[in-house]
């Protein structure tokens, strides 16, 4: 009969960002442990607060099933000598398995006959396994940072204070560090700091709420959402939507309640982004706006307790925020005393990267690169691109950005407008940082897009040119994000700029800094972009369609994306399977291609003439469709060749004895392969 498992790890407050990942990791770890132990299980539930992590598994089998385990040993050729006697290899294998050599069996595999030890194992009770399994699971939860405490040889995100471990309502006995497992949990640190017994998950959830703890993060999130909307209504305002902040705050509290505070309207002269950033990033406050979206001089904060006198909490939060906003106002006023243009020179003293020079040198490189992009794609904005590129990093040496790095670019725009710069230039200064995250907002203007593309490409090519290449999960310069940003901007704007030309232009400007051969760097950078482009497209379209197109060419990203979309749509045809098989056959026969022209005089079968005539007619239609970038139409025209191709293969022996006839037939098939090869490599498609 299946039983339920319950585990709670109670500890000091865990950083908010650690909790959701720990919950996901606990689910993965228990699955791995149970699968390895051959223990069947049902639904898995994970919960978490700053002070506790919970794992509950329903329908856990009472014991392992009996099993027959096979351990493979040496090959038969190494296991017995010429007289059929066991060798030392066989004897050693038997000894290692704890059985007599006579008990070994020969097993036939794909690689031949091998010696094997086949042992029967009686399944153990799950209750016997859990005292070994659970402490291992706790110790294996991976945290970005973990710690030891006292003199115990265990690590966790924060010191553990209690562990509840129950299987079928009974305590699973084990120790982790200095903590023995038990059946008692604890309530809210401030509102109900007492222990209470736990029987199972349902009982635990009831008792937690009685002790002012909401273990379910989704429920806490909905409570917070309702609370901030309630308080915002009382304050005659609306909450500025911020799902990321809502998610973060939900892991900062166990029993949320909201209060409303205010700040002086005098601070509203500071750009709203600075005020919002200060409240969100530094204080975890929700901002308030009126019905027209205008920022109001108020905020909502989430407490971890319900207080008898909320005004005490409000005044404390207002005092902290007032100090923070006073700093922002001071920097804002001081920064206005120096024009943005005058700050550009200061970039010469800011090291961008030791091998790549200063921020000023970087600016000079991507300014020239942006200028070249503009000249090729929209010459009318070249002057504005140069101006925006010159100014876009100047706010990095301002007081405001020094104090609030999150508003870089935004302050550049504000200061540029204050100094009388063109609005298009000022907006481009802010836009050049976009997108800041996957799926994020993209530059609206060509000016901002060109500066953004140039800056990001200089970053990627610069790092690759001095050997700073992302490896595994390590990407300290966020090059993957920059590459995706470039790809998304190009696709969004429809820029027909060959990627290889763009990369080469950037590397030419980096030649004095590069420590690697530029040709080698160019190949690595293009391979890097190819990987990012394939991943991006594979999220939207079948991966084989993506590979089929990209393997032919992806230098023109807009064209490649359009071909992928067309091919993905084309494969929805009912007859796609037979089409793919027919075209794959053509590709496989003429892998290297034949460059000789087709001679109709060498045709010996009517099927050859029919295929040649069909190819001639279709080639013109395909060329016209490609000229219009109508790739689906081109593929549809190519599909009309199938009857002639099928007839050709049915009637004609391609590899004729006469070499001239054979080469002529291969040349005919080469023409077909190259026709659809201009769109995709059909050999990579699954039928």
From Swiss-Prot:
User: What is the protein named?
Assistant: Glycine--tRNA ligase beta subunit
Q: Which UniProt keywords apply?
A: Aminoacyl-tRNA synthetase, ATP-binding, Cytoplasm, Ligase, Nucleotide-binding, Protein biosynthesis
Kindly give the SUPFAM superfamilies that the UniProt entry links to this protein.
HD-domain/PDEase-like
A Gene Ontology biological process term = arginyl-tRNA aminoacylation
UniProt KW Protein biosynthesis keyword: yes
Record GO cellular component, one term: cytosol
Give the multimer and partner information: Tetramer of two alpha and two beta subunits.
State the family it belongs to: Belongs to the class-II aminoacyl-tRNA synthetase family.
Gene, per the UniProt record: glyS
Q: Where in the cell is it found?
A: Cytoplasm
Instruction: Write down the chemical reaction(s) this protein catalyses.
Output: tRNA(Gly) + glycine + ATP = glycyl-tRNA(Gly) + AMP + diphosphate
Q: Does the keyword Oxidoreductase apply?
A: no
Give the EC number(s) under which this enzyme is classified: 6.1.1.14
The Swiss-Prot or TrEMBL record annotates one GO molecular function as: ATP binding
> Which enzyme class?
ligase
Which InterPro entries does its entry note?
Answer: DALR_anticod-bd, Gly-tRNA-synth_bsu, Gly-tRNA-synth_heterodimer
